């Protein structure tokens, strides 16, 4: 058997998350089904499991296929079976593990105060976010190594809640004709819904609904103030570093 590394982008609006679902509506379901049509029966491992409605620009996968498959040949036959909501961007033969070999994951979150068209609603979150300075003040609190037990939803395969955030910041950008705030956060890995809970905490602080002390208290696992993640539709798994 040969091990392959695939880089894909997908529209999270059409799936119930990355992981397999009972009704076969997960990204993993779609990919494994497409491989099965080619006679390839393999579990597909992802660098990160995204929630329902979360998108990916550069999700990385690893899986195995028979030796008669070259990367070029497999790309040719697999890409059309994933389209249109999953795009196979790159495929190469590589002996690695998509999840365990990943060193950093980078996420981006797009937020605008108002949408000019409903057709962008699945891809840009809409809501007030206060000031850019306040958002960056809050984001800085998360940089470093922390126990994120109070910044995760129940479930998921992770047993160690400690994670390292290498960088987290926000900036303004014009995206598809909309003035947006773009959050960027880079960590070694993230717990279930952790990124969205962090984004929610930062927005609520910027809107003066919670204090910086309350964020620190939650980071230190003393008391949880933020329990509901921010909307999923603005979140993108942007890049995975190996």
From Swiss-Prot:
GO molecular function, one term: tRNA pseudouridine(38-40) synthase activity
Pfam families referenced in this protein's UniProt entry, alphabetically: PseudoU_synth_1 (PF01416)
Active site: 51 (nucleophile)
Key words of the record: Isomerase, tRNA processing
Catalysed reactions listed for this entry: uridine(38/39/40) in tRNA = pseudouridine(38/39/40) in tRNA
Organism classification: Bacteria, Pseudomonadati, Campylobacterota, Epsilonproteobacteria, Campylobacterales
GO biological process, alphabetically ordered: tRNA pseudouridine synthesis
Function summary: Formation of pseudouridine at positions 38, 39 and 40 in the anticodon stem and loop of transfer RNAs.
Domain of life, source organism: Bacteria
Name of the protein in question: tRNA pseudouridine synthase A
SUPFAM superfamilies assigned: Pseudouridine synthase (SSF55120)
EC number: 5.4.99.12
Complexes and interactors: Homodimer.
Family: Belongs to the tRNA pseudouridine synthase TruA family.
InterPro entries noted in UniProt: PsdUridine_synth_cat_dom_sf (IPR020103), PsdUridine_synth_TruA (IPR001406), PsdUridine_synth_TruA_a/b_dom (IPR020097), PsdUridine_synth_TruA_C (IPR020095), TruA/RsuA/RluB/E/F_N (IPR020094)
Binding site for substrate: 107
